[in-house]
UniProtKB/Swiss-Prot annotation:
It is found in: Plastid, Chloroplast. It comes from the Eukaryota. This is Small ribosomal subunit protein uS2c. The keyword Flavoprotein does not apply. InterPro entries: Ribosomal_uS2, Ribosomal_uS2_bac/mit/plastid, Ribosomal_uS2_CS, Ribosomal_uS2_flav_dom_sf. One of its GO terms (cellular component) is chloroplast. It holds the Pfam family Ribosomal_S2. It comes from Ostreococcus tauri.
Length: 226
């Protein structure tokens, strides 16, 4: 009896934390994707409210998948979410994309590998690029600008040596290219599913508000916790 009480208490605490983080808030009902109907609890004042009881169950499935993955990319490029993507990737030793998903990042892996190798070479060059080594100020400036250009799009992927075995996506409607490339290559995805998302394009979908930084931070923390 005590064990059951503790489980119920833990569940209630989790639900309370989700509500405080605004995980349950979807979009205006006119902006929804009808495929999300099974995850909608109700419509209130023109806003869809997500069923956070289902969120808990789906989050647990996603957490299991995340723990078994060895090579993960976190994706989320909207300005409000980008810092969270870098933080969670750094915390978990994962790769990330938080500025722009470059088309062909996964499906054109050969070119992608060349870009990462070039970035690595530029890092090494700039560590020793001094006038004493024969580099002019113009040379150093040119190398620096080239590295900054590659860093902007590929800096979070420096440790990516092979195609990922899992991609975590925040903001599905904005990350369509990432979604389609993962689908084409049969790479599993974990996706936060707001009321305007398409659950048929995910391997593990977590019904949750993906616009609020607080909601996203909460879900990512729960997803990656030990």
């Amino acid at each position: 009896m005590f064990i059951k009480f503790e489980k119920v208490k833990k569940l209630l605490n989790m639900l309370q934390s989700m509500l405080e983080a605004g995980v349950h808030f979807g979009h205006q009902s006119r902006r929804w994707n009808p495929k999300m109907a099974p995850y909608i609890y109700e419509e209130k004042n023109g806003i869809h409210i997500l069923d956070v009881v289902q969120t808990i169950g789906e989050l647990e499935k996603a957490r299991t998948a995340f723990k078994s993955a060895k090579n993960v990319i976190f994706v989320g490029t909207r300005p409000a979410i980008a810092p969270l993507i870098e933080q969670v990737a750094t915390k978990t030793g994962s790769n990330y994309v938080n500025t722009r998903w470059v088309g062909g990042l996964l499906t054109n892996w050969t070119t992608m590998t060349m870009c990462l190798e070039k970035l690595g070479r530029l890092d090494a060059q700039l560590e020793t690029a001094t006038p004493k080594k024969g580099f002019t100020k113009k040379d150093i400036l040119s190398l620096t600008r080239e590295r900054e250009r590659l860093e902007k799009f590929f800096g979070g992927l420096r440790n990516l040596k092979t195609l990922p075995d899992l991609v975590v996506i925040v903001g599905q409607p904005n990350e369509r290219n990432a979604v389609l490339e993962c689908q084409k290559l049969n790479i599993p995805t974990i996706t936060l599913l707001d009321s305007n998302c398409d659950p048929t394009f995910v391997s593990y979908g977590i019904p949750a508000n993906d616009d609020s930084a607080r909601s996203v931070a909460f879900i990512l923390d729960q997803l990656t916790k030990d």
